[in-house]
């Protein structure tokens, strides 16, 4: 996202007709609010150049000089809610002279996510568009600690890496807490020190609907009874503000309100949607305990695919 934003700014300075495209609406809204810093005029201007991905299906060919798509792995296929086109990847390619896709295949988390590297390349070739690949070597959100990211991927059995036994501990801080209360105290301490810090969880608990009395995080859905712990998911109203509003720092974020954002510290609660099977020595997703209704569509009898998405969420 840092690279994407720098490219975006340079293109704006060069006078190009460019838009910053963010498929995740929470990520886009948080970016606009942070950059506008409570200034209405600035927010109105930013809203014109920061966009979701649903509108380009009706754009005339080559309407834009450049479209920069951050978190492009979350671009959607036909049939997605409120999207009337056939392929958001193809929409972007057709609508712009140059399209830049920032992609991480291992952050695809739903069956209708279509923005994989292979798919983008295939659609580009279909539309006679030249493809230039650039590999970004380090994770900014992990202080450049590639070893830690590789260890997480190996531990979750996403892929085998050379970091199966750990990473350089000086490069990245990682702790396992005994209770959710201990985790919460640690994150709160970091917040008091001026760090950006939040708690997130896997989608292993239901999210009470607005019509059932939960428009603004009134219901404590995330419960761990054995520890007497209960906290609300992020508010359904202005969901993205959970990440930037200190009055909502007690709320628990989910993948859909946190993906793409960076924090100094993050606490992760693992739920029953993921488990280790000692008989097969495998880490798997659990369909019954995974509560993202859209994320599990068509996956009841596809345990490997379900597990891949759930492990990507925790990654």
Which residues are covered by each model-predicted region?
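Accessory C-terminal helicase-associated subdomains
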Residues: 161, 165-258
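AAA+/P-loop NTPase substrate/partner-engagement loops
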Residues: 13-38, 51-60
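Conserved coupling/interface region of RecA-like P-loop/ASCE motor cores
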Residues: 103-184, 188-192
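Hydrophobic positions on the alpha1 helix immediately C-terminal to the Walker A/P-loop
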Residues: 3, 7
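Short glycine-/polar-rich loops that comprise or flank the Walker A/P-loop
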Residues: 15-16, 96-98, 128-132, 263-266
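A short beta-strand-to-loop transition that corresponds to the Sensor-1 phosphate-sensing loop
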Residues: 25, 71, 96-98, 103-116, ...
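C-terminal accessory regions
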Residues: 100, 251-315
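Conserved RecA-like ASCE ATPase "motif II neighborhood" in helicase/translocase motors
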Residues: 37-95, 250-253
